């Protein structure tokens, strides 16, 4: 509200990280676990931003775990009166979860992201045998990108912009070049699925990759690189910090020049 009042001609929207969530199996317990995790992972933030209410499943979950937020008189009314103009979101990978009964040992899901996708008594991150993984244990799921776009648009009917989408990998500099076809394949497949979501009827007005240049990853430092431009340094060795354009740089330059029409390279 404050932004709209001070800048009435400016549009504003949230930018959370959102992903499709799959149940490990068709076991109703796994389906229920995936449903709860979806509410926590995705709808908690967006329900507040768009509808001005806490998701009912998440509220019950927080209450059961004695983690309800402190609310002052009038807070709910302020939330309810707020309005966003669009939804920005980041997508890197989908998630797969299974039921995690209290007092039991986790059966699967030991990879990077899955370890944080876990709450005993509710859900646990799990492997997905139908999807490939990056060397850092992230699911590669372009189809899940289309699913995520359609889920968000169907639920909220707000224009969408993708603010981050990319692949973090260990790039190798060889004779001043970086041949990162894996990144090109990842981005091409995701853009194709985004185009299909638009064909489905979703209103997507923008797409941004992550990232233009290598930067420090919060999980793996400079070992995990996302950029189109290689920075010649390591975690504890700055080297010469020289920049090198990767193969993906030239590929994406063509994608931009063709407004997404040229995806083959």
Language-model features, listed with the residues they occupy:
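Active-site region of glycoside hydrolase catalytic domains
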Residues: 1-265
């Amino acid at each position: 509200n404050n932004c709209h009042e001070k800048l009435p001609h400016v549009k504003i929207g949230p930018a959370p990280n959102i992903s499709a969530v799959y149940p490990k199996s068709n076991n109703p317990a796994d389906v229920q676990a995936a449903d709860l995790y979806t509410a926590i992972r995705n709808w908690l933030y967006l329900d507040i931003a768009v509808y001005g209410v806490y998701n009912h499943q998440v509220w019950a979950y927080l209450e059961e775990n004695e983690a309800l937020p402190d609310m002052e008189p009038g807070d709910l009314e302020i939330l309810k009166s707020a309005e966003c103009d669009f939804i920005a979101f980041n997508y890197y990978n989908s998630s797969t979860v299974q039921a995690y009964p209290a007092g039991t040992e986790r059966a699967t899901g030991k990879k990077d992201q899955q370890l944080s996708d876990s709450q005993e008594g509710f859900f646990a991150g799990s492997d997905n045998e139908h999807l490939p993984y990056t060397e850092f244990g992230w699911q590669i799921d372009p189809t899940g990108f289309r699913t995520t776009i359609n889920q968000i648009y169907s639920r909220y009917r707000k224009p969408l912009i993708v603010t981050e989408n990319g692949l973090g990998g260990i790039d190798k500099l060889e004779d001043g070049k970086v041949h990162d076809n894996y990144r090109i394949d990842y981005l091409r497949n995701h853009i194709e699925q985004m185009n299909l979501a638009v064909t489905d009827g979703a209103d997507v007005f923008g797409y941004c990759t992550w990232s233009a240049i290598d930067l420090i990853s919060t999980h793996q430092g400079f070992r995990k690189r996302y950029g189109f431009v290689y920075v010649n340094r390591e975690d504890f060795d700055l080297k010469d910090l020289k920049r090198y354009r990767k193969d993906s740089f030239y590929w994406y330059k063509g994608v931009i020049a063709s407004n997404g029409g040229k995806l083959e390279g």
